């Protein structure tokens, strides 16, 4: 295993993802993790991530110096390299010419870490400081136009001023793999087939004959959780799907068909009337979310109680992912937690269930691979993200059944046309937003005053940042024509060309 010490870089999770893609199990912990906990994990190597601080600042992030007593190879990336230089007596200063974006890396000396790597390649830079003097015993391995010491080495300690984990670094994945395999002696043992076998065995042992309650949303995470649990405990899984009336067109039927194919019993609750009555007259986005969250818990509790009376439920399953676990601990210290993640928060006290989180070691892309391994259809696994509150946050203003129907039909047309044009898998997320704006139009000889709808399509890797998708005008024209002709109550279609930032992907 490789252990990454996180110093607050926006790219830290990418380090683990790049190594895992290559079959090398990798975990992330905050830089202040105790040496005792690090020793317990028994890593074969450490990677020190980048970060926003400067090593010469008073409040610079610094791990325990005892990491150097572990006698394992260490790789410092960006800030991590600067920390190594500073710790061993070199000099780091603010750079006159800061480096952000692509740069050409030129290898000047052979090293095991550059085995099979091109002499010159593009790398991704993101730093305001630079090393001007190496510590005693260190050697320069590579340079860039503005960084004379772009890669350094001293025995089994390495430093890279660039970010090998970012896709723009052409040879970055190979460099990380060389460190893990050739320097640390790791083996390629990580993969979803191995994970599935191990996790099913673990779940069987932990749950035994107890019952597990699992809320199914129709999304990828909850579907994969339910599938994995069913493989382990069969009919002791109680899967509950709440239809709140704010789903995409034909969503309920699609989820039911999927679970039927997977041979997993599904308890479907039709709660449309309950949700819509509570949302009546509400237009404020956060209040919508709050009402939907609270109502979901009420409906879920009622259903859980029915099953609880039939036979005691001992566990509650959640689709917590590894990024949720990482983000629950801030690099600023235990007292400054970024956020605590609960997929189903605010459950009543009588639901004193033990929590079970089968996916807590996995990234989103790994969840999809696991789903494929478990037999979930590829078409289902590659669906675009869908918000928990559903179409409620895609209808601006007050919600009504007629507005839901209007949005469902328009959204269905947009997605259908994306698939026909082989564009669906090329955009990260696409959907329609029903605006609380009416506009004047003309249909035949008649004046209309109807809803406007907005098409939204973005490209992203993880949703943290996103750029709007460049869709051909002819494609947009086709979608617009279909919506205005086929969906009653819509006479205008617009396309959102806002990126994130400054906008968010969803409108509410």
Swiss-Prot record:
The keyword Ligase applies. Residues 1-189 form the Glutamine amidotransferase type-1 domain. The keyword Nucleotide-binding applies. GO terms for biological process: GMP biosynthetic process. ATP binds at residues 217-223. Its EC number is 6.3.5.2. Pathway: Purine metabolism; GMP biosynthesis; GMP from XMP (L-Gln route): step 1/1. GO terms for molecular function: ATP binding; GMP synthase activity. It catalyses: XMP + L-glutamine + ATP + H2O = GMP + L-glutamate + AMP + diphosphate + 2 H(+). InterPro entries: Class_I_gatase-like, GATASE, GMP_synth_C, GMP_synth_GATase, GMP_synthase, GMPS_ATP_PPase_dom, NAD/GMP_synthase, Rossmann-like_a/b/a_fold. The active site is at 78 (nucleophile), 163, 165. One of its GO terms (cellular component) is cytosol. Keywords: ATP-binding, Glutamine amidotransferase, GMP biosynthesis, Ligase, Nucleotide-binding, Purine biosynthesis. PROSITE patterns: GATASE_TYPE_1, GMPS_ATP_PPASE. Homodimer. This is GMP synthase [glutamine-hydrolyzing]. It comes from Helicobacter pylori (strain ATCC 700392 / 26695) (Campylobacter pylori).
């Amino acid at each position: 295993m490789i252990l990454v010490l996180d110093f607050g870089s926006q790219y830290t999770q990418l380090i683990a993802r790049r190594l895992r893609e290559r079959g090398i199990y990798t975990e992330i912990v905050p830089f202040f993790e105790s040496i005792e906990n690090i020793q317990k994990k028994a890593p074969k190597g450490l990677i020190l991530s980048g970060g926003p601080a400067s090593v010469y600042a008073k409040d610079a992030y610094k791990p325990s110096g005892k990491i150097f007593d572990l006698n394992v190879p260490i790789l410092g990336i960006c800030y991590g390299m600067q920390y190594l230089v500073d710790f061993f007596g070199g000099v780091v200063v603010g750079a006159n010419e800061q480096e952000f974006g692509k740069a050409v890396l030129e290898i000047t000396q052979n090293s095991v870490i550059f085995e099979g790597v091109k002499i010159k390649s593009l790398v991704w830079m993101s730093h305001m400081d630079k090393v001007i003097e190496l510590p005693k015993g260190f050697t320069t391995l590579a340079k860039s136009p503005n960084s004379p010491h772009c890669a350094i080495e001293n025995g089994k300690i390495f430093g890279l001023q660039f970010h090998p984990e970012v896709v723009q670094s052409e040879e970055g994945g190979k460099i990380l793999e060389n460190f893990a395999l050739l320097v640390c002696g790791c083996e390629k043992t990580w993969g979803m087939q191995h994970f599935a076998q191990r996790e099913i065995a673990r779940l069987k042992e932990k749950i035994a004959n107890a019952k597990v309650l699992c809320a199914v949303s129709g999304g990828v995470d909850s579907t994969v959780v339910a599938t994995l649990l069913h493989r382990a405990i069969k009919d002791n899984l109680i899967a509950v799907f709440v239809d709140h009336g704010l789903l995409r067109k034909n969503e309920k039927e699609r989820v039911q068909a999927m679970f039927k194919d997977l041979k997993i019993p599904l308890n479907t609750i039709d709660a449309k009337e309950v949700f819509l009555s509570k949302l009546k007259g509400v237009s404020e986005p956060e209040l919508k979310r709050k009402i939907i969250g609270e109502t979901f818990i009420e409906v879920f509790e009622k259903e859980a109680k029915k099953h609880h009376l039939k036979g005691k439920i001992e566990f509650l399953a959640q689709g917590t992912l590894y990024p949720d676990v990482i983000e629950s601990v801030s690099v600023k210290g235990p007292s400054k937690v970024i956020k605590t993640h609960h997929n189903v928060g605010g459950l009543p006290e009588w639901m004193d269930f033990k929590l079970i989180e089968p996916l807590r070691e996995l990234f989103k892309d790994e969840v999809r691979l696991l789903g494929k391994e478990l037999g979930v259809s590829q078409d289902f696994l590659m669906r675009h993200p869908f918000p928990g509150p559903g179409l409620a946050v895609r209808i601006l203003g007050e919600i009504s059944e007629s507005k839901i129907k209007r949005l469902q039909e328009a959204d269905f047309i947009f997605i259908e046309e994306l698939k026909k044009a082989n564009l669906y898998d090329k955009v990260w997320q696409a959907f329609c937003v029903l605006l609380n704006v009416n506009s004047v139009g003309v249909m035949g000889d008649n004046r209309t005053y109807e809803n406007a709808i907005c098409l939204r399509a973005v490209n992203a890797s993880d949703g943290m940042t996103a750029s709007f998708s460049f869709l051909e005008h002819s494609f947009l024209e086709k979608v617009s024509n279909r919506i205005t002709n086929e969906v009653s109550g819509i006479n205008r279609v617009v396309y959102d060309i806002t990126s994130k930032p400054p906008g968010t992907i969803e409108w509410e």
